[in-house]
Amino acid sequence: MDPFVVLVLCLSFVLLFSLWRQSSGRRKLPPGPTPLPIIGNILQIDVKDICKSFSNFSKVYGPVFTVYFGMNPVVVLHGYETVKEALIDNAEEFSGRGILPISERITNGLGIISSNGKRWKETRRFSLTTLRNFGMGKRSIEDRVQEEARCLVEELRKTKASPCDPTFILGCAPCNVICSVVFQKRFDYKDENFLTLIKRFTVNFRILTSPWIQVCNNFPLLIDCFPGTHNKLLKNVALTKSYIREKVKEHQATLDVNNPRDFIDCFLIKMEQEKDNQQSEFTIENLVGTVADLFVAGTETTSTTLRYGLLLLLKHPEVTAKVQEEIDHVIGRHRSPCMQDRSHMPYTDAVIHEIQRYIDLVPTGVPHAVTTDIKFRNYLIPKGTIIITLLTSVLHDDKEFPNPKIFDPGHFLDENGNFKKSDYFMPFSAGKRICAGEGLARMELFLFLTTILQNFNLKSVADLKNLNTTSATRGIISLPPSYQICFIPV
């Protein structure tokens, strides 16, 4: 048979199979825009602003709708009530992790973030318990964050009140906290290995926000067959994991099971305890994946929030002044802030919550997946279907937060100036898959920001009227625009 005829027949078969698969699946799933064969809804989605496309779809198809990434259906949940019903009311059924092609290549299903089933449950439980009880009478996590806050202040003093881009310095602080917990020690901000680690995290974070990654997730074939920034991403991940493996080997050579020094030691001891269990999830590769996840979850997300937060405080000097007034009243100038102070600082607490709400760091959340066939809002969602919870629709709900596009700490204050909680505050997601590093992130944001404002006044290089606070990207992560700032010692 003529090769051309064979090619045409093969392509026709693929096209017909795609049409059959999509049409048969769509009968059960929530409604949504009509997908094209093979490529799905990619042409109807603005990969530079996915959230805007999804919000527009919700106006047409309702709060539960389906889009296709290539040939794969993805169910999107819009609005607080829908997200709550899924992640909280049906927590177990929606507790799976939706694995997109890029994340699958990065993690191989290991660690905390992208694992599922028994591996996820055991690794997450162990990690949370270890971090919560870390030190067993030695230095607490709070001690480590306070130490890093003091080191951060000293680094900021070295700028001598000159204009600077705070990206690098603010990236060092949360990364060093993770290093302290995982590797036993913090690094000097000039250490070459530390600088390399920071650079890789920063580059990878920016690549992950790019439209190209969204295209790769729609067409996985591109990952192996085409050049692009995804190759730089995967190379950086491989180099980082290689560095972690070296650290693990160093720990193995000096391990004292009666005196664990850090997270790696605790994991190695757990491995030894389960060495006779052939089904154990505590392996070297899972340790490497888990440590990598701790850096991913605990470094760039926190540093980006800090960087965006300082930009907002620059833009709103009246807010900054009130926070500093509260710092003077509750803490003073002669001791370091501690977590006990937070309950006595309602305005500062409200400001930090508003920063997280306003910047909407992960607008689409990290993908979930249903762990079983489930009937949800009269639709049948098959086991394994990827679920996207549109967190931006919760954090920017105009009924809960009047004028949601405006930065206003009053969103979290009652009429008496007391801190006011909101069920709509979901920057860390919700349910069983809520961010494992939530407690650490909240601690770092409070201690780093209060320590900075205790020691410095903030000065903008640009005129405040021209200071842009609109996110530079609106993909899976919101990044602030670049800016210059002066840290003026008080």
Curated annotation (Swiss-Prot):
This is Cytochrome P450 2C20. One of its GO terms (biological process) is xenobiotic metabolic process. It is found in: Endoplasmic reticulum membrane; Microsome membrane. It holds the Pfam family p450. GO terms for molecular function: heme binding; iron ion binding; oxidoreductase activity, acting on paired donors, with incorporation or reduction of molecular oxygen, reduced flavin or flavoprotein as one donor, and incorporation of one atom of oxygen. Cytochromes P450 are a group of heme-thiolate monooxygenases. In liver microsomes, this enzyme is involved in an NADPH-dependent electron transport pathway. It oxidizes a variety of structurally unrelated compounds, including steroids, fatty acids, and xenobiotics. Induction: By 3-methylcholanthrene (3MC). PROSITE patterns: CYTOCHROME_P450 (PS00086). It is an enzyme of class 1 (oxidoreductase). InterPro entries: Cyt_P450 (IPR001128), Cyt_P450_CS (IPR017972), Cyt_P450_E_grp-I (IPR002401), Cyt_P450_sf (IPR036396), Cytochrome_P450_fam2 (IPR050182). Its cofactor is heme. Its main location: endoplasmic reticulum. Its EC number is 1.14.14.1. Heme binds at C435. It is a peripheral membrane protein. The keyword Heme applies. Keywords: Endoplasmic reticulum, Heme, Iron, Membrane, Metal-binding, Microsome, Monooxygenase, Oxidoreductase. It comes from the Eukaryota. GO terms for cellular component: endoplasmic reticulum membrane. It catalyses: an organic molecule + reduced [NADPH--hemoprotein reductase] + O2 = an alcohol + oxidized [NADPH--hemoprotein reductase] + H2O + H(+). Belongs to the cytochrome P450 family.
